[in-house]
């Protein structure tokens, strides 16, 4: 087994693994499970400080992105796709699948969305049913201010769908200070629960838009509206993955018990960037670094596969490459959730330094030592 230091999925704590092995009831029929699910959703609402309805869907985080688009999009709807990263641009595919007309607002992939520049665009064109935006676009590691972006969109009467799969639990997010209508999360990133669950936070306005559609939602599994009154009706649209939800519940308990989780993510991310920069390793981003992942450019003269292979074979540590327009250009270190501890990052930096030097790439400092010095400040 490798030490998993990827940009997600992440390492999983033993108590989460144990919770997923507990005896199961029938989640379709046992009324106690409806209470368990409902209470777990209430914990999710507490994470984001919201009265918006929290839901858990059976499916990896991408399900939430598609479900949001499936449930809101009608044929011909214009949808603003805020694109400053691979996942940001990817929302356009979901919009098109359900008959919408995606309009891309494309910005520099090396920086977060500039709210003032987005507003300048909206002044010229704001006829959109909703907009999509990514909180942390993991391929580049950029972190967008989705709270402020959603408030700007609301000013122009535009609903917001936000993907926080790779940010939430590592980055603070206050839905009460936003106008986000559907927030999409996943289990396998900073919460450090195995992949398999989508979490959604849905506003009344979004539910009203779904209920008042001219055409039926063109999906069953991705139909969020079917979940709206699950507790009152004691009915789920499909059988809930009970073992996954038991693991999620313990993951949430771990999160609430960790009083320094956001501070630690921010500090470890900053120290990681400082060490890499001091070592002469170029970061992909110019600004807007997320607290959950650090993305570095592949040095000239080597390939991403050489770096990844050496990390795995020589040190037993798995980090991430990338795909799409960043394929072969960057590698990524995930320091989120259970990965976000000094004792996890230090051997990762030591392995990276050993790998680069083995491949003939000089490193200007001791990465691990520089990281520890920064952590001690």
Residue ranges and their predicted role:
Residues 329-377:
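PLP-dependent enzyme catalytic core of the Aspartate aminotransferase-like
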Residues 282-314:
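Conserved PLP-binding catalytic core of the aspartate aminotransferase-like
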Residues 176-188:
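Conserved active-site segment immediately N-terminal to the catalytic lysine
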């Amino acid at each position: 087994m490798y030490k998993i230091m990827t940009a997600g999925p992440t390492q999983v704590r033993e108590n989460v693994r144990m919770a997923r092995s507990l005896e199961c009831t029938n989640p379709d029929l046992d009324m106690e499970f409806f209470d368990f699910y409902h209470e777990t959703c209430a914990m999710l609402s507490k994470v984001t400080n919201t009265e918006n309805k929290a839901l858990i869907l059976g499916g990896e985080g991408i399900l939430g992105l598609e479900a949001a688009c499936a449930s809101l999009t009608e044929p011909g709807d214009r949808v603003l796709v805020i694109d400053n990263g691979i996942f940001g641009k990817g929302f356009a595919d979901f919009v098109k699948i359900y008959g919408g007309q995606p309009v891309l607002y494309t910005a520099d992939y090396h920086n977060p969305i500039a709210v003032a520049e987005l507003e300048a665009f909206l002044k010229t064109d704001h006829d959109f049913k909703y907009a999509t935006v990514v909180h942390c676009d993991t391929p580049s590691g950029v972190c967008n201010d989705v709270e402020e972006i959603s408030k700007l969109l609301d000013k122009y009467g535009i609903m917001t769908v936000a993907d926080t799969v790779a940010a939430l639990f590592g980055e603070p997010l206050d839905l009460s200070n936003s106008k986000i209508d559907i927030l999409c999360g996943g289990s396998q990133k900073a919460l450090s629960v195995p992949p398999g669950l989508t979490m959604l936070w849905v506003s009344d306005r979004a539910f009203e838009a779904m209920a008042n559609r001219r055409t039926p939602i063109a999906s069953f599994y991705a139909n969020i509206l079917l979940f709206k009154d699950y507790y009152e009706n004691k009915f789920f649209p499909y059988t809930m993955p009970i073992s996954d939800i038991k693991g999620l519940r313990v993951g949430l308990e771990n999160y609430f018990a960790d009083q320094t989780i956001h501070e630690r993510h921010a500090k470890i991310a900053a120290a990681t960037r400082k060490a890499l920069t001091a070592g002469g390793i170029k970061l992909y981003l110019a600004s807007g670094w997320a607290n959950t992942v650090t993305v570095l450019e592949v040095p000239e003269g080597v390939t991403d596969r050489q770096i990844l292979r050496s990390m795995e074979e020589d040190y037993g540590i798995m980090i991430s490459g990338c795909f799409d327009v960043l394929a072969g250009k960057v590698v990524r270190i995930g320091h989120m959730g259970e990965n976000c501890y000094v004792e996890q990052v230090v051997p990762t930096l030591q392995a990276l330094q050993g790998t680069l030097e083995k491949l003939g790439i000089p490193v200007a400092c001791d990465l691990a030592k520089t990281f520890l010095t920064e952590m001690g400040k």
